[in-house]
């Protein structure tokens, strides 16, 4: 690891510490992710090798953070694995916060919301096309290149070898705000719809500059969702009452979605409602979302 000079710790990712570092030879800035992977005498576990090869494959998309290399080092006599990613200076949470807070609060420009949402759908479609779910999409792991106006998905693909924990090991609670109702209700058989739900929540948050469903526990999270969208029924979502954590919830009627996103044009509200369908099978796919009329005014040739 002499190849890289660590400049500063920039965060604790879901999977370990993240450092901003510089390649001593080229001066290129990189993000070093130190993984907490238990390596044995045999070296890197096969599950991790598989995940890394998936990451390599996925990072060929412009809208997924690029994995540059994998480095092995030794710390206290134990092997440590570092993943080396391209470095981006900010994330979508910080980007939205800059519009919400500070001396000059203002909405995000419509063209920026459209562009970022389109890029997010494109990145998610790329992952789903390779059979990979992200399962933890949130503004904090969407990295933004402000100069170029590019949004990239990070913290991806380490789903099985490095299971996404409920608590990150810094004991911060992993946020539930973007989690799909089937996951909150204990479904173990989930599919691409879990990511689309998260994309819908992120879309609404760019428009509102605050979270759509800010729950602080799994139950509170469900109640936030049910109060806005109505308590789901078997007609709407066959099998919902058989899910592990289903209870007799209070019966709420659906509210008008437009009121939560008053500045959003009708096509945008339509797309949002297609992402926030209760039945995962009825949620729009990332690929179909890219063809939605909401994006008709966007110059797609740039992507």
From Swiss-Prot:
<keyword id="KW-0067">ATP-binding</keyword>
<comment type="similarity">
    <text>Belongs to the protein kinase superfamily. CMGC Ser/Thr protein kinase family. CDC2/CDKX subfamily.</text>
</comment>
<dbReference type="GO" id="GO:0030332">
    <property type="term" value="F:cyclin binding"/>
</dbReference>
<feature type="active site" description="Proton acceptor">
    <location>
        <position position="136"/>
    </location>
</feature>
<dbReference type="GO" id="GO:0007165">
    <property type="term" value="P:signal transduction"/>
</dbReference>
<keyword id="KW-0723">Serine/threonine-protein kinase</keyword>
<feature type="modified residue" description="Phosphotyrosine">
    <location>
        <position position="15"/>
    </location>
</feature>
<dbReference type="GO" id="GO:0000082">
    <property type="term" value="P:G1/S transition of mitotic cell cycle"/>
</dbReference>
<dbReference type="GO" id="GO:0008353">
    <property type="term" value="F:RNA polymerase II CTD heptapeptide repeat kinase activity"/>
</dbReference>
<feature type="modified residue" description="Phosphothreonine">
    <location>
        <position position="14"/>
    </location>
</feature>
<dbReference type="GO" id="GO:0005524">
    <property type="term" value="F:ATP binding"/>
</dbReference>
<dbReference type="InterPro" id="IPR011009">
    <property type="entry name" value="Kinase-like_dom_sf"/>
</dbReference>
<protein>
    <recommendedName>
        <fullName>Cyclin-dependent kinase B1-1</fullName>
        <ecNumber>2.7.11.22</ecNumber>
        <ecNumber>2.7.11.23</ecNumber>
    </recommendedName>
</protein>
<keyword id="KW-0597">Phosphoprotein</keyword>
<feature type="modified residue" description="Phosphothreonine">
    <location>
        <position position="170"/>
    </location>
</feature>
<dbReference type="GO" id="GO:0010389">
    <property type="term" value="P:regulation of G2/M transition of mitotic cell cycle"/>
</dbReference>
<dbReference type="GO" id="GO:0005634">
    <property type="term" value="C:nucleus"/>
</dbReference>
<keyword id="KW-0547">Nucleotide-binding</keyword>
<feature type="binding site">
    <location>
        <begin position="10"/>
        <end position="18"/>
    </location>
    <ligand>
        <name>ATP</name>
    </ligand>
</feature>
<dbReference type="InterPro" id="IPR000719">
    <property type="entry name" value="Prot_kinase_dom"/>
</dbReference>
<dbReference type="InterPro" id="IPR017441">
    <property type="entry name" value="Protein_kinase_ATP_BS"/>
</dbReference>
<dbReference type="GO" id="GO:0000307">
    <property type="term" value="C:cyclin-dependent protein kinase holoenzyme complex"/>
</dbReference>
<dbReference type="Pfam" id="PF00069">
    <property type="entry name" value="Pkinase"/>
</dbReference>
<dbReference type="InterPro" id="IPR050108">
    <property type="entry name" value="CDK"/>
</dbReference>
<dbReference type="GO" id="GO:0106310">
    <property type="term" value="F:protein serine kinase activity"/>
</dbReference>
<feature type="domain" description="Protein kinase">
    <location>
        <begin position="4"/>
        <end position="295"/>
    </location>
</feature>
<dbReference type="InterPro" id="IPR008271">
    <property type="entry name" value="Ser/Thr_kinase_AS"/>
</dbReference>
<dbReference type="GO" id="GO:0005737">
    <property type="term" value="C:cytoplasm"/>
</dbReference>
<dbReference type="GO" id="GO:0010468">
    <property type="term" value="P:regulation of gene expression"/>
</dbReference>
<keyword id="KW-0808">Transferase</keyword>
<dbReference type="GO" id="GO:0004693">
    <property type="term" value="F:cyclin-dependent protein serine/threonine kinase activity"/>
</dbReference>
<keyword id="KW-0418">Kinase</keyword>
<feature type="binding site">
    <location>
        <position position="33"/>
    </location>
    <ligand>
        <name>ATP</name>
    </ligand>
</feature>
């Amino acid at each position: 690891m002499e190849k890289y000079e660590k400049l500063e710790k920039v965060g604790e990712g879901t999977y370990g510490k993240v450092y901003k570092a510089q390649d001593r030879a080229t001066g290129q800035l990189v993000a070093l992710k130190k993984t907490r992977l238990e390596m044995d005498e045999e070296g890197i576990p096969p599950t991790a090798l598989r995940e890394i090869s998936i990451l390599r494959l996925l990072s060929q998309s412009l809208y997924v953070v690029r994995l540059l290399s994998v480095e092995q080092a030794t710390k206290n006599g134990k092997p440590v694995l570092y993943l080396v990613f391209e470095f981006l200076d900010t994330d979508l949470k910080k980007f939205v916060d800059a519009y919400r807070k500070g001396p000059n609060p203002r909405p995000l420009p419509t063209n920026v919301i459209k562009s970022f949402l389109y890029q997010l759908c494109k990145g998610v479609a790329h992952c789903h096309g390779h059979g990979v779910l992200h399962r933890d999409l949130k503004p904090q792991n969407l990295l933004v290149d402000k100069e170029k106006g590019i949004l990239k998905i990070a913290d991806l693909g380490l789903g099985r070898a490095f299971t996404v924990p409920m608590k990150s090991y810094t004991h911060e609670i992993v946020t539930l705000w973007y989690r799909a109702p089937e996951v909150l209700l204990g479904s173990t058989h989930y599919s691409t719809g879990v990511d689309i739900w998260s994309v819908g929540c992120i879309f609404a948050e760019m428009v509102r500059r605050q979270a759509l469903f800010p729950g602080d526990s799994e139950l509170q999270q469900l109640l936030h969702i049910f109060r806005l969208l109505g308590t789901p029924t078997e007609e709407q979502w066959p099998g919902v009452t058989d899910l592990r954590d289903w209870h007799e919830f209070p019966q709420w009627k659906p509210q008008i979605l437009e009121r939560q996103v008053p500045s959003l044009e009708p096509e945008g509200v339509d797309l949002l409602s297609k992402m926030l369908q209760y039945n995962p099978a009825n949620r729009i796919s990332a690929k179909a979302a890219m063809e939605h009329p909401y994006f008709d005014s966007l110059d797609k040739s740039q992507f």
